[in-house]
């Protein structure tokens, strides 16, 4: 079979599939965004070594990393550490008059071992905002300041 794709969450499963060489592209989700970059440690290097494509699902974490309040998605009493951190990131961006969606997507686009970011748009307005965010230029200083903030 040619052109087989693979999508699964546990990294061990991805790594086993990569070793077989029987797939062309991998779909990771929730593994590379502002909240976590776990795929960069093992999946991206292994896939690059085998010349496999990587699709990065959940770049915006179902909207939590767009600048909308996390509470608009999930009641505060149900928040976990990811929700708390996403809200801190939103506030950090607001304090700097920065568009969080720009930061989120530009961060993901800097990783050249990722070949696609399926965002998902609910309407034309979201599509336009997502396109604009991918075309924004942010300085290295912005990413350095974000990293230094330790969120």
Predicted features by range, described:
Residues 1-151:
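Beta/alpha (TIM)-barrel catalytic core signal, keyed to glycine-rich beta->alpha loops juxtaposed to Asp/Glu
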């Amino acid at each position: 079979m040619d052109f087989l794709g693979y999508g699964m969450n546990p990294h061990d499963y991805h790594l086993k599939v990569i070793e077989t060489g029987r797939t062309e592209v991998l779909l990771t989700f929730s593994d590379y965004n502002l909240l976590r970059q776990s795929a960069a440690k093992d999946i991206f290097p292994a896939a690059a070594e085998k010349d496999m494509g990587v699709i990065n699902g959940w770049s915006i974490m179902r909207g939590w990393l767009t600048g909308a309040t996390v509470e608009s998605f999930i009641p505060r009493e149900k928040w976990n550490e990811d929700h708390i951190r996403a809200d801190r990131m939103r506030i950090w961006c607001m304090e700097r008059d920065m568009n969080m969606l720009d930061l989120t997507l530009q961060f993901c686009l800097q990783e050249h071992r990722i070949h696609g970011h399926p965002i998902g748009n609910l309407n034309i307005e979201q599509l336009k905002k997502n396109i604009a965010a991918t075309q924004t230029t942010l300085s290295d200083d912005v990413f350095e300041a974000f990293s230094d903030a330790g969120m």
